[in-house]
A protein has these predicted regions:
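Short, well-ordered beta-strand segments enriched in hydrophobic/aromatic residues
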Residues: 243-251
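Generic amphipathic alpha-helical segments used as scaffolds and interaction surfaces in large
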Residues: 92-95, 188, 192, 248
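Surface-exposed beta-strand/loop patches in extracellular or lumenal glycoproteins
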Residues: 253-259
Length: 259
């Protein structure tokens, strides 16, 4: 229930006491940023953190600004929809909302550019992923949900978006690793499985430590589903130091395959 100005002043105060313990592993100071599209929070927090007497080289006393955005495929927060029982409309609703991540990064990134044109401050998307209704019969407080190819595609398009904004997005954490929301691993007693989302992360690992290559797709079909206009294909491309090029191409169509 804080105003952004009040929070930012508290942040400025307490970050003063957080010092590096060793130069080889400097502490990264992450300021609490916006939830989804709350650009007023971003504006006011940055305005306050950069206000005099902040030194110019302190870049707002932060190394990163956090951002949360969950894909809620259902009609509302109170009706999120099932993770496994969904229609074609539900497929496209999830992907359309996942693609909104691109708009959010551009919106908050543009505000950051006003204060930090050199992009020293990372946008830290520290909570993202699908948020469905909990699996029937499980403790609702544990947020346990199943995982399908729809979740895999949401992960794929989101990681492609992060790749394309790697000059500003410096960290991104799916929520969460095991047994909660869009997990990469599900367990029950001594048993465990790797989810479709896990396999997306495994396939995308070749982008790590690589350099982004500019890429665009032409002649791609657009799928119109209600309020969402969704490209049938979406991609990101990188090149490793040895010249190996990695292309991750996501097919968003629920019905059409592409050669």
């Amino acid at each position: 229930n804080m105003t952004p100005e009040y929070y930012a002043n508290l942040y400025r105060r307490y970050q003063t006491y957080v010092r590096h313990y060793q130069d080889s592993a400097p502490i990264q100071k992450i300021c609490g940023g916006p939830n989804a599209g709350d650009d007023n929070w971003t504006k006011k927090v940055l305005e306050t953190c950069f206000a005099s007497p902040a030194p110019e080289d302190a870049h707002g006393f932060m190394d990163g600004l956090s951002m949360h955005y969950y894909t809620v495929p259902g009609e509302s927060w109170m009706n999120k929809g099932s993770a496994t029982e969904f229609t074609t409309d539900g497929w496209y609703q999830a992907l359309g909302k996942a693609l909104h991540m691109d708009d959010l990064i551009k919106k908050h990134g543009a505000i950051l550019d006003q204060y930090d044109p050199e992009k020293k401050i990372g946008l830290m998307v520290d909570e993202w992923g699908n948020w469905h209704e909990v699996e029937p019969g499980t403790n609702p407080g544990f947020l346990y949900q199943q995982n399908t190819m729809r979740d895999a595609l949401v992960a794929a398009v989101t990681l492609n978006i992060f790749n394309k904004h790697c000059d500003r997005v410096k960290m991104a954490c799916i929520a969460q690793l095991i047994n909660v929301l869009q997990s990469v691993i599900l367990t029950e007693g001594e048993k465990m499985i790797l989810t479709p989302t896990y396999h997306i992360f495994h396939m995308y690992k070749y982008h790590q430590d690589a350099e982004l290559l500019r890429s665009d797709l032409t002649g791609v079909d657009t799928i119109q589903n209600g309020e969402f206009s969704i490209p049938a294909l979406q991609e990101s491309v990188s090149v490793q130091k040895d010249g190996t090029i990695t292309v991750t191409l996501a097919n968003l169509s629920a019905e059409q395959s592409y050669p």
